[in-house]
């Protein structure tokens, strides 16, 4: 973990992004130009104990500058897209369970309506984790990791792949329209390539006409880069922040 940032970050309206995973979390501080000016990485193995989570988060707080906004980025495979014309907020969980009947009862459900897409993004995340962060950061905003990328996918033919340790999310947009958003398990880089080629085949797209972007932490993307580039040479690897 890097040192106290308050010594150099003063009197500027920063925003804070916290990306939480089961093996720890990363904190990014952005300036008014949306540039990362500081980063904190904290190893933490979450076992469901909110007291230890609270202690871990509180240990970070003295190192953080005052921020105009704080967002918790949730990484979870429990998500779905539904057309705006069908969406009813009171039935968000019901929509989610159509695709994910195993959503834990302890999870809290959130929804996000896109301005540039005719769909609503629904996701669920551990309510205990959410409440722990809100207790410490009362103005906290909750966001799924995929939402910014869906919002940015305008007028593009792009396949965005988000890789974690044993799972990947795939977003395919054609002419800025979402054609597919789904979650897949994988074990090897060859599995990732298979899923991408299989998706393009079933949707009857020429894979060479698509930009491909692979997102993940630096170590994870480097492990798969050589194999993926062999079969998908147009792939651009980007570190998630």
Give the label of every model feature segment.
Residues 14, 29, 111-205:
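Small-residue (GG/TT-enriched) beta-loop-alpha framework at ligand/catalytic clefts
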Residues 25, 70, 235:
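Hydrophobic anchor at the start of a short beta-strand
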Residues 30, 37-47, 51-151:
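Active-site neighborhood for divalent-cation/phosphate handling
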Residues 17, 65-78, 207-218:
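Short glycine-rich phosphate-binding loop at a beta-alpha junction
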């Amino acid at each position: 973990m890097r040192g106290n940032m308050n010594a150099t970050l003063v009197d500027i309206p920063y925003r804070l992004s916290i990306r939480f995973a089961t093996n720890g979390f990363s904190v990014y501080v952005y300036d008014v130009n949306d540039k990362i000016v500081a980063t904190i990485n904290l190893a933490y193995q979450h076992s469901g104990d909110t007291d230890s989570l609270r202690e871990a988060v509180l240990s970070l707080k003295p190192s953080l500058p005052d921020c105009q906004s704080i967002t918790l980025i949730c990484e979870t495979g429990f998500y779905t897209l539904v057309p705006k014309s069908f969406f009813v907020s009171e039935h968000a969980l019901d929509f989610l369970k159509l695709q994910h009947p195993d959503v834990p009862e302890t999870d809290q459900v959130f929804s996000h309506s896109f301005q540039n897409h005719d769909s609503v993004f629904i996701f669920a995340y551990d309510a205990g984790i959410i409440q722990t962060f809100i207790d410490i950061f009362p103005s906290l905003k909750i966001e799924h990791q995929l939402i910014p990328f869906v919002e940015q996918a305008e007028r593009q033919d792009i396949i965005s792949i988000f890789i974690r340790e044993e799972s990947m999310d795939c977003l395919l947009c054609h002419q800025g329209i979402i054609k597919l958003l789904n979650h897949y398990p994988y074990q090897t880089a060859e599995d990732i390539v298979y899923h991408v080629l299989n998706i393009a085949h079933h949707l009857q797209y020429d894979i060479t006409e698509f930009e491909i972007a692979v997102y993940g932490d630096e170590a994870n993307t480097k492990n798969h880069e050589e194999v993926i580039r062999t079969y998908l040479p147009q792939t651009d690897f980007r570190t998630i922040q």
